[in-house]
């Protein structure tokens, strides 16, 4: 081949784009959350996808295809659903995202929810959050990572923290959900909610501006919450590798 373009054309002719696309779509089928997806480390969905790729690698002719066992802190997020009836009697059901923490309600349970601005120590002054859901705003790009307000809520006795992205990540649309890594004890439960859904909840709480400054009497709302998020340490997973024949 005498030119880069000739090499590019030969490469394009050899690559089966449709097969790659179809495989990627098949990889979307195993999921831990039937509504949102998720295929996380150590989960049944990850194992099923790994077996799919193992078979594909063998069938396409890769050599020395093997599974190397590893231990991971696994996370299996099945669902997090929040129901709320507003002051006008309208009922809502919100799908929440989650972070890698452990929380099980075993069906819908009633919780009090409070909105605490940025979730700083100052925001908690004179407020009892024991056993409650704490809603906060967060900008993970320019302020702090999710584990800081989550651990603060955990130390204060909150049942779980629910974060809504306020600038930073998760800004592609007001209905988007954020999912990123977290560092902390698995019992410090954390979930994410979209800006659009959070706005409905905040409208009825009305006790704080987004800055966290009080604007009136403190107010809680009652919600129903059903969540299943499971973290298990030292679960088996696999790295799957194969070698392309040739030199």
Annotated model-derived regions:
Residues 23-28, 66-67, 113-115, 132-137, ...:
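Structural recognition of the beta-strand scaffold that forms the well-ordered cores
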Residues 50, 78, 121-122, 142-151, ...:
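Short alpha-helical segments and helix-capping/turn motifs at coil-helix boundaries
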Residues 119-170:
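A conserved hydrophobic secondary-structure block that centers on an alpha-helix together
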Residues 13-18, 22-25, 29-133, 140:
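Noncatalytic luminal/extracellular "stalk/propeptide" segments of secretory-pathway proteins
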Residues 94-126, 180-247:
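Soluble metallo-hydrolase cores and metallopeptidase-like ectodomains found primarily
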Residues 8, 17-24, 47-54, 146-150, ...:
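Extracytoplasmic/secreted envelope proteins and their assembly/folding machinery
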Residues 74-82, 162-181:
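BRCT (BRCA1 C-terminal) domain core and associated BRCT-interaction motifs
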Residues 34, 71-74, 120-121, 139-143, ...:
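Solvent-exposed loop/turn segments at secondary-structure junctions
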């Amino acid at each position: 081949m005498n030119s880069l373009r000739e090499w590019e054309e030969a490469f394009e002719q050899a690559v089966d784009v449709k097969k790659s696309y179809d495989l990627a779509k098949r990889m979307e089928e195993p999921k831990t959350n039937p509504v949102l997806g998720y295929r996380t480390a150590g989960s049944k969905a990850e194992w099923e996808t790994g077996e799919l790729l193992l078979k594909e690698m063998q069938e396409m002719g890769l050599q020395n295809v093997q599974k190397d066992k590893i231990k991971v802190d696994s996370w299996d997020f099945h669902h997090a659903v929040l129901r709320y009836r507003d002051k006008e009697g309208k009922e809502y059901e919100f799908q929440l995202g989650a972070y890698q923490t452990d929380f099980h309600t075993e069906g819908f349970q009633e919780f009090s929810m409070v909105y605490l601005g940025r979730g700083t120590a100052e925001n908690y002054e004179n407020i009892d959050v024991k056993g409650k859901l704490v809603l906060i705003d967060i900008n993970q790009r320019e302020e702090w990572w999710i584990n800081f307000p989550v651990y603060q809520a955990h130390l204060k006795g909150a049942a779980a923290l629910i974060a809504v992205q306020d600038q930073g990540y998760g800004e592609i649309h007001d209905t988007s959900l954020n999912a990123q890594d977290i560092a902390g004890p698995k019992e410090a439960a954390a979930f994410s909610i979209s800006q659009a859904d959070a706005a409905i909840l905040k409208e009825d709480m009305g006790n704080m501006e987004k800055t966290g400054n009080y604007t009136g009497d403190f107010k809680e709302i009652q919600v129903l919450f059903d969540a299943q998020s499971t973290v298990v340490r030292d679960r088996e997973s696999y790295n799957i590798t194969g070698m392309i024949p040739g030199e």
